[in-house]
């Protein structure tokens, strides 16, 4: 089970939002590269970056901070990034910078042709982020609910050749209310590509539950507010996941 620390970037700082609200942000570090180093030293084997300004602006806004993180962690730690990725040139630039995976969210839902082109041009590097509330997909920084069912879109994108799906329950993100295990497993069972859980991770019990469903296709989990608030010790959680996996 991959435990993937999230580094959310706003105005060059590492922050956490409450339920995706840019006006409800807490700064956890003014040096995101140092934060990246901290998580790698604690045992992280992948990092999850979000360009929050980019997600709302529709184009990259924290490029300098992202490049600094990539320089800090080097080639050994895969880094995935979402937020403001709406064209092939942006993907190419990030991959040239050393990014392993780009996460396409809103653009995948609104412009599936772009996603298909991205999978052809950058096979193996494309992850789709599906954000949902009550099984319905949301777009535009969670501000718009669509009528699309998560599983239907997941299957469609799997056919395009995406690497994996990050599933976020936006009713729980940043609320420390526990992962929506049932919804995550339901999506994983509908697909053959891996699903990464996101939204609501709060304690070691969540880690135990996730490890129990890893065989269903749940590859990992994004670790956000809980590891910043101290509710979850990241190093202990990764050690627990490895122990349960017999690693």
From Swiss-Prot:
One GO biological process term: L-tryptophan biosynthetic process
Keyword entries, A-Z: Amino-acid biosynthesis, Cytoplasm, Histidine biosynthesis, Isomerase
Enzyme Commission number, as recorded: 5.3.1.16
Chain segments annotated as coiled-coil in the UniProt record: none
Involved pathway(s): Amino-acid biosynthesis; L-histidine biosynthesis; L-histidine from 5-phospho-alpha-D-ribose 1-diphosphate: step 4/9
Main location: cytoplasm
Places the protein is found: Cytoplasm
Residues of the active site: 8 (proton acceptor), 131 (proton donor)
GO CC annotation: cytoplasm
InterPro entries assigned to the protein according to its UniProt record, in alphabetical order: Aldolase_TIM, His_biosynth, HisA_bact_arch, Isoase_HisA-like, Isoase_HisA-like_bact, RibuloseP-bd_barrel
GO function terms (MF aspect): 1-(5-phosphoribosyl)-5-[(5-phosphoribosylamino)methylideneamino]imidazole-4-carboxamide isomerase activity
Top EC class, one word: isomerase
Catalytic activity as recorded in UniProt: 1-(5-phospho-beta-D-ribosyl)-5-[(5-phospho-beta-D-ribosylamino)methylideneamino]imidazole-4-carboxamide = 5-[(5-phospho-1-deoxy-D-ribulos-1-ylimino)methylamino]-1-(5-phospho-beta-D-ribosyl)imidazole-4-carboxamide
Keyword Phosphoprotein: no
HAMAP family recorded: HisA (MF_01014)
PANTHER family: 1-(5-PHOSPHORIBOSYL)-5-[(5-PHOSPHORIBOSYLAMINO)METHYLIDENEAMINO] IMIDAZOLE-4-CARBOXAMIDE ISOMERASE
Family, per entry: Belongs to the HisA/HisF family.
Protein name, UniProt field: 1-(5-phosphoribosyl)-5-[(5-phosphoribosylamino)methylideneamino] imidazole-4-carboxamide isomerase
């Amino acid at each position: 089970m991959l435990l993937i620390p999230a580094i959310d970037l706003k105005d060059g700082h590492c922050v956490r939002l409450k339920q995706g609200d840019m006006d409800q942000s807490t700064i956890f570090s003014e040096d995101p590269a140092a934060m990246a180093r901290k998580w790698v030293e604690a045992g992280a084997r992948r990092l999850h970056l979000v360009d929050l300004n980019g997600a709302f602006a529709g184009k990259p806004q924290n490029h300098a901070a992202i490049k600094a993180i990539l320089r800090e962690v080097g080639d050994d730690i895969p880094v995935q990034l979402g937020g403001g990725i709406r064209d092939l040139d942006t993907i190419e630039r990030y991959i040239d910078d050393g990014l392993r995976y780009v996460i396409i969210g809103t653009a995948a839902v609104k412009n599936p042709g772009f996603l298909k082109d991205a999978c052809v041009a950058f096979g193996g590097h494309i992850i789709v982020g599906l954000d949902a509330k009550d099984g319905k997909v949301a777009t535009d920084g969670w501000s718009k609910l669509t009528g699309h069912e998560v599983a239907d879109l997941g299957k469609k994108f799997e056919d395009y050749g995406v690497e994996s799906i990050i599933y976020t329950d936006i009713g729980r993100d940043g609320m420390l209310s526990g992962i929506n295990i049932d919804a995550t497993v339901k999506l994983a069972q509908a697909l053959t590509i891996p699903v990464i859980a996101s939204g609501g991770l709060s304690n070691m019990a969540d880690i135990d539950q996730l490890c129990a469903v890893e065989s269903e296709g749940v590859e990992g989990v994004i670790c956000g507010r809980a590891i910043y608030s101290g509710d979850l010790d990241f190093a202990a959680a990764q050690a627990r996941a490895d122990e349960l996996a017999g690693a």
